[in-house]
Amino acid sequence: MLLGSHVSMNGKKMLEGSAEEAHKFGESTFMIYTGAPQNTRRKPIEELNIEKGHEIMKAHGLSNIVVHAPYIINIANTVKPHVFELGVEFLQSEIERTQALGAQDIVLHPGSHVGEGTDAGIKKIIEGLNEVLTNDNNVRIALETMAGKGSEVGRNFEELARIIDGVNHNDRLSVCFDTCHTHDAGYNVKEDFDGVLNEFDKIIGVDRIKVVHVNDSKNDIGAHKDRHENIGFGYIGFDALNYVVHHDTFKDIPKILETPYVGEDKKNKKPPYKLEIEMLKQQKFDEDLKNKILQQ
């Protein structure tokens, strides 16, 4: 089972450190940002320590790296041309880094239309993706299902389908299915996940799903908030998320936890991933999990 989490990539070790952290958490896959998600400062490819990273991965049975594009990319912006242009250029360079890292998919938030309306946002995203997907490689852009917070585009399956249909090289587009976002967007992930998946299949096709983000939600269905919660401690609940993780449809697909670190002290929060992954492998909810995470 391909199950992992977001891990850090920084310092001199870069990918080597990411692979070590993923192994420490008992993971078989992992997701990284190539640098800080809120800025465009990036190390050159030759400083990402890729060879060492792959050696660690091979030694510990890790595979299927997933890359996440930074939040600052907004190719749905029709108001500020420089924001759109920066997004296109930076996404192109992130795809080069993704390919160098040996990853197949780079997850992208489709963007926000900043008040100009969904149609304008979708049109701009299509324009941007058509510019980006001319480079000759096999990296896919995995459009993420969004919660519908603010002016986010991709808040329902129909919006993602419109983007995919408008892109010329859409064989290079996949989908990252986020359980928290989809729940927050109003889909019944908790009680009828197969129904949600069937709807997705009719509108987009489940074969497009190449990454799953496994997150509980701090808010009730349809809240359009996007606030992740630890597995089993939110409104989706353990049973539903355990069902998603062990679903046949996602057997060969990386399932990535992006659940929050635990603890009141901001400087001393603990990563939940090792124990959450163990719990999902055992398929039994541990209501004392947060205390155990704090005691790590």
UniProtKB/Swiss-Prot annotation:
EC number(s) per UniProt? 3.1.21.2
Q: Per the record's keyword annotation, is Hydrolase included, yes or no?
A: yes
Which organism's genome codes for this protein?
Staphylococcus saprophyticus subsp. saprophyticus (strain ATCC 15305 / DSM 20229 / NCIMB 8711 / NCTC 7292 / S-41)
Q: Which cofactor does it need?
A: Zn(2+)
Sequence positions that bind Zn(2+) 1: H68, H109, E144
Single biological process term from Gene Ontology: base-excision repair
Q: Which InterPro entries match?
A: AP_endonuc_2 (IPR001719), AP_endonuc_F2_Zn_BS (IPR018246), Xyl_isomerase-like_sf (IPR036237), Xyl_isomerase-like_TIM-brl (IPR013022)
GO molecular function ontology, one term from the record: zinc ion binding
Annotated binding of Zn(2+) 3, by residue: H181, D226, H228
Determine the domain of life of the protein's source.
Bacteria
Protein's name according to its UniProt entry:
Probable endonuclease 4
* UniProt keyword terms in alphabetical order: DNA damage, DNA repair, Endonuclease, Hydrolase, Metal-binding, Nuclease, Zinc
Which EC class is the enzyme in?
hydrolase
| Protein task | Endonuclease IV plays a role in DNA repair. It cleaves phosphodiester bonds at apurinic or apyrimidinic (AP) sites, generating a 3'-hydroxyl group and a 5'-terminal sugar phosphate.
Q: Which family does it belong to?
A: Belongs to the AP endonuclease 2 family.
Family matches, as PROSITE patterns: AP_NUCLEASE_F2_1 (PS00729), AP_NUCLEASE_F2_2 (PS00730), AP_NUCLEASE_F2_3 (PS00731), AP_NUCLEASE_F2_4 (PS51432)
The record's free-text note on cofactor binding: Binds 3 Zn(2+) ions.
**Binding-site residues, Zn(2+) 2:** E144, D178, H213, E258
